[in-house]
């Protein structure tokens, strides 16, 4: 198709109408939303490998292997699960404890901020809640035990209270011959962001005898991350397992990365807060938020002595079965289990315990994938 010169001139001189203001505003909003959407998808959804290989900061000396003795050392060579002779789990009810958990005042710190859970403050422990655990009757059911040459695990299902106050929790009593038997795993074996997998899958892939969720390090870009003697990150409130089998918790102002690494940090978890003072006493204050201090599903790690550890998962948000535990109740449970030090791990839908090729607890909402 051809146009005359006059027609071309008319088309050339034709003035374009400007876009209405309202249309310009809508266009800008749509483009901005699209840009934010792409950023959100990339930054918060798409798996991203950090590319960080980590720095080896500790190894367990071969001479230290087997330095701790398993309770059933004579039978430890048989890697098999055990149950009651009649095939039914034992169910026992313990009377109220004669020795009550006490509280201790932690070092006073002003303007503390736990970067794993921002905008935290010091919340006083609840003496009534602590007493309800230490003076209550606990029903205990052994779910089974399993052992290898280097580890022994016995898992219990326990409950305390009734009706809307009932708490149901699971306790793994773990003995190892060396700290090297306590291992951590990344989702897909990769340190990064938005890389997630189920506790079950990670346990199976790593051939774990027992597993529990950790601190969900991928939820925060600022925290300490030490896995199997390799440091990936180090800037927050932390619980450290050392190569000698001892465990210690640190608040932000107490934590000295260089000193901890020099001591031989084997594993480190960031979430918190610390629950006990290192002598088995419930802390007088918890560095946390109001929401995290309320009754929720929980996971925690505790140390009785070098080579002897307690892992606890508390179910919650299911009235009549388990309401969940406050930090005071969780601390009292860890103290009641004989722990000297203990640390709160990621909870809520993350709280899951794996044993004998199954998730033994009832995770809130079916649980969620973790990093």
Label for each model-derived stretch:
Residues 203-206, 215, 279, 334, ...:
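Sec/Tat-exported extracytoplasmic proteins
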Residues 2-235:
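Zymogen propeptides
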